[in-house]
Amino acid sequence: MSNYSHSSNNPFLKVSTKEDKPSSFHKIAEDEEYEVTSPTDATFRASKNADNSAGGNNPLESGRAGESGDGIRFGRDPFGNFQGGAEGQDESSIDPNGFRPTGGPDHGFPNNYALGRRTSVSAESLNPTSAGSDSWTPPSHPKSEEQLARLKTAVSNNFLFSHLDDEQSRTVLDALVEKPIPAKDIKVISQGDAGDYFYIVEEGHFDVYINPSGSVQPGPDGAGTKISTIGPGGSFGELALMYNAPRAATIVSTEPKSTLWALDRITFRRILMDSAFQRRRMYEAFLEEVPLLSSLKPYERAKIADALDTIKFPAGEYIIKEGDPGDAFYLLESGEAEAFMEGVEEPVKSYKRGDYFGELALLDDKPRAASVRAKTEVKVAKLGRDGFKRLLGPVENIMRRTEYSSRPSTAT
């Protein structure tokens, strides 16, 4: 294996060059930057010879490229707290070459580790519960009632939290850390960097930039093209944690004062991904019991499971109403429901666990032909129009063959 490597692709190493152009973003001094991004400090053991202050060519991290004395030190955690021995290291002990092509025991890395290459994040198991027998305890950061109220408002509409039960929600809220962003044009995460934290926006707006090269480049336009803006209640940073991949975009603050809440990688995977994994397993088991879907392959049912949303209705509440446009398909998970038609006093159909309704209004693009009301408290799995069209194609003919005389609900 060749020892040659490109330092520009390595998120842990910075090489200063005289040709680098100044950044269009504000430089943030190390002692006051409130740095919110970090390579995974715990991934590698400490090395007394590690490069800690080489100049950066990342315009969103180091400000003006080429100022090697002001580069980011990796001895701090994502919240600006010093964690290692890098800060007090004698400048004379730092390798003037700025990088080492390969690792080795002397450098604190494996012999075959190429420092010049971009590194991937160390992956946990895809099944977050696979290590559930250990003694992991979720972090807990005390919060005032006012902070909790603000935080609950911030996460109330976030899709990643919509399926958590009360205990899981409380664990996540306790683990979140408030992160004030004190100025405009502060880089929160950089494309291509390792991902350690997931962020929720409470206050302020943040622009999203993507560079086609896959990482931030030198120069005023090194962040790439702006593709969107994230506002209060939004979130970012989950993809790198979910898929153990480098950051997919650069996020920059746009207002003089903003507030984020940060959730660390381990808690994110243990709580949010564990919830998603268990939810998929639950739905897969449920879908296997639905006669309509018995002909589907396991991977097809898994796709449906990922697309379902759980909704609860109290007894007496209408799930769908006659005459309304058809926008979703429903599977009854628990409880009992009944279908009614205008002019008919008695229910025209009863439902129990495993039954479904709402399909023909989607198949034929017609209004609902009947109303469905919860007889008891019910829990339904809802599949939206797009997911229905995309995922239930293999059983469309089965649904169309069902006779209305024996199953009037198919017209709903």
Curated annotation (Swiss-Prot):
Residues 23-159 are annotated as: Dimerization and phosphorylation. Keywords: cAMP, cAMP-binding, Nucleotide-binding, Phosphoprotein, Repeat. GO terms for cellular component: cAMP-dependent protein kinase complex; cytosol; nucleus. InterPro entries: cAMP-dep_PK_reg_su-like (IPR050503), cAMP_dep_PK_reg_su (IPR012198), cNMP-bd_CS (IPR018488), cNMP-bd_dom (IPR000595), cNMP-bd_dom_sf (IPR018490), RmlC-like_jellyroll (IPR014710). The modification Phosphoserine is found at S120. It comes from the Eukaryota. Disulfide bonds: none annotated. PANTHER family: CAMP-DEPENDENT PROTEIN KINASE REGULATORY CHAIN, CAMP-DEPENDENT PROTEIN KINASE TYPE I REGULATORY SUBUNIT-RELATED. Tetramer, composed of 2 regulatory (R) and 2 catalytic (C) subunits. In the presence of cAMP it dissociates into 2 active monomeric C subunits and an R dimer. This is cAMP-dependent protein kinase regulatory subunit. It comes from Emericella nidulans (strain FGSC A4 / ATCC 38163 / CBS 112.46 / NRRL 194 / M139) (Aspergillus nidulans). The lineage of its organism: Eukaryota, Fungi, Dikarya, Ascomycota, Pezizomycotina.
